[in-house]
Amino acid sequence: MLQFDLLKTDPSSHARRGQLTLNHGVVQTPIFMPVGTYGTVKGVMPRSLQEMGAQIILGNTFHLWMRPGLDIMQSFGGLHGFEKWDKPILTDSGGFQVWSLGAMRKITEEGVHFASPVNGDKLFMSPEVSMQIQTVLNSDIVMQLDECTPYETNGHKTTEAEARKSMEMSRRWAKRSSDEFQRLGNPNALFGIVQGGMYENLREESLQALVEMDFPGYAVGGVSVGEPKDEMLAIMAHTPHRLPAHKPRYLMGVGTPEDLVQGVADGVDMFDCVMPTRNARNGTIFTRYGDLKIRNARHKTDHQPLDPSCTCHACAGTSGVSWEQGGRDGFSRAYLHHLDRCGEMLGPMLTTIHNLHYYLNLMQEVRNALEAGNFTEMRARFKAERARGV
C-alpha cells in the first residue's frame, strides 16, 4: 500500500511538505533515506538509525540477490526480518549496478546478461526477475528495472538519439515491471523512473508515458552519473515539479546538502545518496558551517566536536546537549583525528553517525520551515552558514 498526503506547499518555490504511509510505517517528507546496500547502513546499528531520526532506508536488490541470495532472504520473511529494521525500506531495481558492470554485461530488449561479480556465474536480470527479487525482499517501495542512461557513451557525450533509445527501452521495461508486479500480487508500491539523459524533451516524453501507466510514485533517475553540476541542476529544475502533485517524487542518488535543499525547492520529496556514509569513512564531515576534513593535521589538538551545533552521539555524547549549548560530552576533533590516523573502526562509525544525523536533521529543519512558512529564509540562512567555513 501507499498513501501520500500533501500537507503544505511553498508559495515561492515548488517545495512541498507531505506524509507518506507505507506498509511498515509513516514517513514525513521531504526525507533523506540512508543507503544500506548489503542489508546494513555501514557501521550503524538499526537502533542508532532510529535514534537519529531515520524513517526509511534503502536496500540494494542486485547485491542482496548475489549475497545472501533469495532462499535465505525468503526464510527470514524478507529484508525487514533479516536486518531487523521494522520501518519502511525502499529497494532499487538493480539496474544501476548492472549498468556499472560495464564490459561484464550485455543489455538487450529482454534484459541484461552478465557475469556475477561474486563468482563469475552467468546471470540474467529482466524486469520480471527484478520484480520477483523485490517481492521476496518485501520492500515497501519497489523500483522498476530501468536502463541508467550514461552521461558519456563510448567516450563522447551521449547523443539525443542514444538517450532516446535508452529511454524508450526503460519505458517498455516500466510496463513489463508493472505487469509482473501485479501478477505477483505484491502488496507494496511500485515506482516508475523518468529517464532521458540530459535532454529535457526526452524527460518530458518519459514522464508523460509513465504518468499514463499510473504508478503510485515516481523517481527521477539518470542524474549524478558523471554529468557537470549545471546540467544536473537543470534536470532537477525541469523534471520533478512536472510529476503528479498528488504522488511522491524521488530524486535518485543525489547528493550534497546543497543539492538536497535545492531539490526540495524543485519539488522533490525523497532523496538517497551514499555521500554521507562514504565521505564519513574517508574523513570528510558535513557540518552546519561547511565541510571538515578530519585528517587535516590542524585538528590534532582541537577540543571542539565535529560540529559545535550538533546533538548527535559523536558531537554531544549521551547528554544530547550541543557544544554551543554548553555540552561537553561529545568526542573531540582531536580524538576522531587520532582514531582515523590509527585506523580504529570506531572513527568511521562515529563520523558516519554524525554525517547521517546531519542529513536527517537538515531535512527536519526543511520540514519545520515548510510548516512555518519560512522556507525561503531557511534556505538563505543555510547557504550563508555553509559558506562560513569551519
UniProtKB/Swiss-Prot annotation:
What Enzyme Commission number does this protein have? 2.4.2.29
Q: Provide the gene name from the record.
A: tgt
Q: Name one Pfam family in it.
A: TGT
Q: Which organism is it from?
A: Delftia acidovorans (strain DSM 14801 / SPH-1)
Q: How is the cofactor bound?
A: Binds 1 zinc ion per subunit.
Catalytic reaction(s) noted: 7-aminomethyl-7-carbaguanine + guanosine(34) in tRNA = 7-aminomethyl-7-carbaguanosine(34) in tRNA + guanine
| Keyword Metal-binding assigned | yes
Which InterPro entries would you find in this protein's record? Answer: ArchSynthase1/Queuine_TRR (IPR050076), TGT (IPR004803), TGT-like_sf (IPR036511), tRNA_ribo_trans-like (IPR002616)
Which biological pathway?
A: tRNA modification; tRNA-queuosine biosynthesis
Top-rank taxon of the source lineage equals Bacteria
Q: GO cellular-component terms in the record?
A: cytosol
Region annotation (RNA binding) ranges: 253-259, 277-281
Give me the residues that bind substrate, please.
D92, S93, G94, G95, F96, D146, Q195, G222
Named cofactor requirement(s): Zn(2+)
Task: Give the family, as the similarity comment puts it.
Answer: Belongs to the queuine tRNA-ribosyltransferase family.
Catalytic-site annotation from UniProt? D92 (proton acceptor), D272 (nucleophile)
Protein name, UniProt field: Queuine tRNA-ribosyltransferase
One GO BP:
queuosine biosynthetic process
* NCBIfam families the record matches: Q_tRNA_tgt, tgt_general
Give the quaternary structure.
Homodimer. Within each dimer, one monomer is responsible for RNA recognition and catalysis, while the other monomer binds to the replacement base PreQ1.
Q: Which residues bind Zn(2+)?
A: C310, C312, C315, H354
* SS bond list: none
Explain the purpose of this protein: Catalyzes the base-exchange of a guanine (G) residue with the queuine precursor 7-aminomethyl-7-deazaguanine (PreQ1) at position 34 (anticodon wobble position) in tRNAs with GU(N) anticodons (tRNA-Asp, -Asn, -His and -Tyr). Catalysis occurs through a double-displacement mechanism. The nucleophile active site attacks the C1' of nucleotide 34 to detach the guanine base from the RNA, forming a covalent enzyme-RNA intermediate. The proton acceptor active site deprotonates the incoming PreQ1, allowing a nucleophilic attack on the C1' of the ribose to form the product.
Which keywords, in A-to-Z order, does the entry hold? Glycosyltransferase, Metal-binding, Queuosine biosynthesis, Transferase, tRNA processing, Zinc
- EC category: transferase
One MF annotation (Gene Ontology) recorded for this entry: metal ion binding
